[in-house]
């Protein structure tokens, strides 16, 4: 990486941040300007993810772990297996598996925390589906807004990757803008951050008080889980 998006401070904890996606598992250690990855896919189990990360980072010295998963997570508990991955994510003891203090969070929430600049922020992650999180004066509130009704289906069915493939980029962008406008009207955030792998496909003007995020924010979010109160 040419630019570091996660901080290094004297006495800062050495946090290994793991961002689990449908195609890759990515790992970053704060203080090292390097990102490592390996392929995931629909058969990847929770244990295989941990084993892969441990093998990938044998030469890294860290004291804590943050894991972002594409699944609902409440109070550190994974509610169901990720849709685009394998099984065994809900029953895995992540802290025991890594052998370090470990925090597990929804992947959109982790990226949201890394994008947060105070106040009331709505984060929308455009990728395979629609990730969503609000942060209210420092308190993280993961959401599943993608499942709410929109037009003739749900928000996710229009602005997720399958929606983009069906609509084409031009109509998909219009659906994204309308999604931002509707959710902003209902949730009243101070500002909106749009992240995820498809955020870069949004060219042109964005709605007021809306900006594009950076996928590296997930790693900053993983670090912040151990140094900030949220």
What are these regions (language model features)?
Residues 15-19, 62-66, 121-125, 193:
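Short glycine-aspartate micro-motif
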Residues 24, 183-215:
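Glycine-rich phosphate-binding loops at beta-strand->alpha-helix junctions
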Residues 27, 67, 194-196, 222:
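Residue-level signal for inorganic ion chemistry
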Residues 2-51, 136-166:
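Short glycine-rich, Thr/Ser-proximal phosphate-binding strand/loop in the N-terminal lobe
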Residues 25-29, 71, 113, 130-136:
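Short beta-strand scaffold segments in enzyme catalytic cores
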Residues 69, 126-128, 196-197:
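Short secondary-structure boundary segments
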Residues 25, 89-92, 96-111, 120, ...:
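Glycine-rich phosphate-binding loop plus the immediately following alpha-helix
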Residues 37, 41-54, 58-66, 71-120, ...:
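Glycine-rich phosphate-binding loop and adjoining helix at the ATP-binding site
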